[in-house]
Amino acid sequence: MRAWVVPMRFRVSWMLAGCCAAVVLAGCGSSSGPDVLTAPIQVVRTTDGTVGYRELGSGPPLLLIVGGGDSMDDWPPSFVDALAAHHKVVVFDNAGIGRTSAVSAPGSLSITAMARQTSALISALRLRHPAVLGWSMGGMIAQALAVTHPAQVSRLILAATAPGTGKAVPLPAYTFSVFSLSSKKQAASLFPKNQAAAAGAFLSAVGHYQSYYGPSAATIHSQKHAVLQWMAGHDAAGRLAGEIRVPTLVAGGTADHFIATANDRLLASSVPGAKLILFDDAGHAFWFQDAAKFIRVVETFIG
């Protein structure tokens, strides 16, 4: 395993006036191309309940799995649109959020159960071997998916997440208390303290969704249980990272307030052949601080 460290500083200019990352190099002002803000929320019945999702773009499929405490409306539109320029992108709500069915009784949710529902979504939408990008808790779900349903995944991008081998550096005690803070403070927690502009731009970006919503307090509590069980090594799928055979990219920020950089390294060393890339001076939402650069990394990796 070799780690690449990418110097990174936030560039707020590409977010101004609603410019999307897809046109950073070409210049702002283009109204053509995929637009997640106009993609309707759809509901599909799966073998594991209903799932609310959006899809846009065309090309090889790319499934985005959002983190804990988030809905699919926590993916900034510019980020999704940029990926959809070359892919059929699917974003969706995890179990118990929005129009997605719960998959367990309160307090007994597991990462593997959410991966099972994600697998059911892939089957219901007839996605052919999608690349899967999971952020934070979504990266844990992506790992479990690759372990339990390897034939469904072509490539794995694990962003700001942790292994489930039982060796992970624990989350800080304040992690789940963040969800009780104001939206402004929640956004700030995703970035280093010297990146206030990034936090403001993130909050502005997700504010473009007309009917923004998030999970209930009960769902967040269930997710907390699932994440802590995973990181402690109590979820069977998490202990099988060594069996992941799909090409895997692990990425993280060196200034992440939640997921220690040591976890990025541990995860990359646990998955055979995994590549590791670290973004310098970047927080939990490193993929947003310099979206254009991260998207180029993703596009190169997916091929």
Which role fits each region the language model picked out?
Residues 273-303:
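Catalytic active-site module of serine/aspartate enzymes centered on a nucleophile-bearing elbow/loop
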Residues 139-150, 156:
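Short glycine-enriched nucleophile-adjacent loop
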Residues 49, 54-101:
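Conserved HGGG/HGGXW glycine-rich cap/lid loop of the alpha/beta-hydrolase fold
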Residues 244, 250-252:
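Short beta-strand/loop motif that positions the catalytic acidic residue
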Residues 91, 96-131:
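Active-site loop/oxyanion-hole signature of alpha/beta-hydrolase fold enzymes
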Residues 257-263:
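Conserved alpha/beta-hydrolase "acid-adjacent" motif
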Residues 147, 156-184:
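Flexible "cap/lid" loop of the alpha/beta hydrolase fold
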Residues 212-237:
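Hydrophobic, aromatic-rich cap/lid helix
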